[in-house]
Amino acid sequence: MAAEEAEVVSPLIVDTAPDTSGTAAASLAAAVSAAAAAARTGSQAQVSKAALAAKLMSLSGVFAVHKPKGPTSAELLNRLKEKLLAEAGLPSPEWNKRQKQTLKVGHGGTLDSAAQGVLVVGIGRGTKMLTSMLSGSKRYIATGELGKATDTLDSTGKVTEEKPYDKITQEDIEGILQKFTGNIMQVPPLYSALKKDGQRLSTLMKRGETVEARPARPVTVHSISLLKYQPPFFTLDVECGGGFYIRSLVSDIGKELSSCATVLELTRTKQGPFTLAQHALPEDRWTINDIAQSLKRCTSLLPEELTFKKSKSEPSSDQALSCGYITLRETKREDDTVKTL
């Protein structure tokens, strides 16, 4: 939510007019105008580029992309921006956080570099609405390995402990899952987006600095089920609320079984109304037209009566957005940050 009074719209509404407020939008508007002027005396290709640039400016809302393993969520956003600007024939900006960017995109809910799946993206004024996606439900498929612990709680880290697991049965795992369901307390991993003195704990850990464990905090798990157990590997289907760490869950399950465990594979299959199978655009469909269609499709997921009330005062850090059938609480948490580039 912006600090100033503004019209609050659904995060999934596609604007028909460009957002020309602010230096960043003005810079893009100038680039589009220049492209259009050149097109008036140029080739059909130039006309097409000018039309694409104008269409890119008009995009505003929230959609989903498929994040593969490897890049960070921020790196993926940079790649998305570069592809869209290149398609429209507009200059690609220097990735300097101190500079105003011509095209605003953001994501609502980080995925680790080793993870894959649904990444919710806001474009244009849609970036202002990403906070509401953070506290919503998410669903994951996670594969863990018993008998091994790492410093990062996943396969990218160094092995710190090994314990026997040969006596653990499928019934043992299924029997403890109820302990991790509902409103529970969870200690977040040290390798995380949580911050100390303005720096991420993961950054401090990589530099070899000593970092104290954070206290347990309340989180919500809607459901957990064991999909497969082939020792030492087990696969879980987890639906949870915001601020929940699958890596911590798998580690805690290992400890509860008098062993240890770490995450091998992690896929986010759903965030809010967006599913990996139906809504997440793969990279070969990161085009202006495909994203425009995706924005319209995402809008259709919401009931027509879904509207957000206009706030007449500056929002607090814990503001409720009320709509016809649900209330989304915008609670700012250190790890649940909206990344905007």
From Swiss-Prot:
GO terms for molecular function: pre-miRNA binding; pseudouridine synthase activity; tRNA pseudouridine(55) synthase activity. InterPro entries: PsdUridine_synth_cat_dom_sf, PsdUridine_synth_N, tRNA_psdUridine_synth_TruB. Its EC number is 5.4.99.-, 5.4.99.25. Gene3D superfamilies: Pseudouridine synthase. SUPFAM superfamilies: Pseudouridine synthase. It comes from the Eukaryota. GO terms for biological process: mRNA processing; mRNA pseudouridine synthesis; positive regulation of pre-miRNA processing; tRNA modification. The modification N-acetylalanine is found at residue 2. The active site is at 112 (nucleophile). Its main location: nucleus. It is an enzyme of class 5 (isomerase). It is found in: Nucleus; Cytoplasm, Cytosol. One of its GO terms (cellular component) is nucleus. Belongs to the pseudouridine synthase TruB family. Pseudouridine synthase that catalyzes pseudouridylation of mRNAs and tRNAs. Mediates pseudouridylation of mRNAs with the consensus sequence 5'-GUUCNANNC-3', harboring a stem-loop structure. Constitutes the major pseudouridine synthase acting on mRNAs. Also catalyzes pseudouridylation of some tRNAs, including synthesis of pseudouridine(55) from uracil-55, in the psi GC loop of a subset of tRNAs. Promotes the processing of pri-let-7 microRNAs (pri-miRNAs) independently of its RNA pseudouridylate synthase activity. This is Pseudouridylate synthase TRUB1. The gene is Trub1.
